[in-house]
Regions:
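Transmembrane alpha-helix interface motif
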Residues: 1-40, 46-52, 164-255
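Helix-loop interface residues and adjacent transmembrane-helix termini in multi-pass membrane transporters
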Residues: 17, 36-37, 58, 131, ...
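Interfacial loop-to-helix junctions that mark the boundaries of transmembrane helices
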Residues: 35-39, 63-67, 105-112, 230
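Membrane-helix interface segments
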Residues: 40, 60-61, 147-149
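Interfacial helix-loop-helix linkers and transmembrane-helix boundary segments
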Residues: 44, 60-69
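Alpha-helical transmembrane segments and their membrane-interface exit regions
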Residues: 49-59, 73-77
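Juxtamembrane/interface alpha-helical elements of multi-pass membrane proteins
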Residues: 68-178
Length: 255
């Protein structure tokens, strides 16, 4: 279970001690501003501030880069699609293997706008994820009346995903010690065997876990975590942050 603590950051940072409900509501408000922003300046500002917060709470650069790699790829893809296949104002053109590609100025602006929204929204969620334990986040979602069945499924998936990861590491190390990944064909065959073993283990674990939970009185309803009262300082700080960012967004919209 050491994987559960592999992304533990600076517990002394004030952001990690803020109520998960306050952080979640603030993130939703800021996310709404980012998505509805008519320009790209505000989403980029939210992205920069969020990345700075992630670094401030002790998130390793490698972890941060891995977390942002997929949304960054999507943002770049959208930007390129908008640049070359959308718009009416030609910007520049070039040929590749006889294929003429024309970039459009208005398509570039639209692509930058969408890409900035993607990165701004992902960065806000990253701050909440890196600064909040998963169980506290699920408790906050339960307080927000998210369907309990979704929360239960997320908790089970989060808990037993690490067990499957440990099983995968054991099987992979055994295969590697037996030269199971020497060569492309042999490595592909070993990977298929690994995937099949994990599927079988997942079914076996689900049956044993279900039996154990029923024997311990599980009736389909997971007990909810008790929520502590809101702290006025945290609520006030969150309101000031949201209002301040809202004022900046409104100012840039007017300008």
């Amino acid at each position: 279970m050491h994987h559960l603590h592999s992304h533990t950051h600076l517990a002394a940072h004030p952001l990690t001690r803020v109520d998960a409900r306050v952080k979640l509501l603030s993130a939703v408000a800021l996310l709404t501003m980012v998505i509805s922003s008519p320009g790209s300046a505000f989403p980029l500002l939210a992205c920069v501030l969020s990345i700075a917060l992630c670094l401030a709470i002790g998130t390793p650069l490698r972890t941060l880069a891995l977390r942002f790699s997929e949304p960054l790829f999507i943002a770049v893809t959208v930007l390129l699609l908008k640049l070359f296949f959308s718009g009416n104002s030609p910007f520049f053109s070039f040929s590749i293997a006889g294929l003429e590609l024309v970039a459009h100025r208005d398509g570039l602006m639209e692509g930058v706008r969408i890409a900035s929204r993607i990165m701004g929204g992902v960065s806000l969620l990253a701050v909440v994820g890196f600064s909040t334990p998963f169980t506290d986040l699920m408790a906050a979602l339960s307080w927000l009346r998210v369907p309990q069945v979704l929360i239960d499924v997320a908790l089970f998936a989060w808990r037993y995903l690490f067990l499957l990861l440990e099983d995968a590491q054991v099987v992979y190390n055994a295969q590697k010690n037996r030269l199971g990944y020497v060569g492309y064909r042999r490595g592909l065959s070993s990977f298929g065997t690994l995937a099949g073993v994990l599927v079988i283990k997942a079914f076996d674990n689900s049956q044993s876990i279900t039996t154990a939970m029923v024997q311990r009185g599980y009736d389909g309803v997971m007990p909810r975590s008790l929520q502590r009262p809101f702290r006025m300082a945290e609520v006030t700080g969150a309101l000031l942050l949201v209002l301040g960012m809202g004022a900046v967004r409104l100012l840039w919209t007017v300008i």
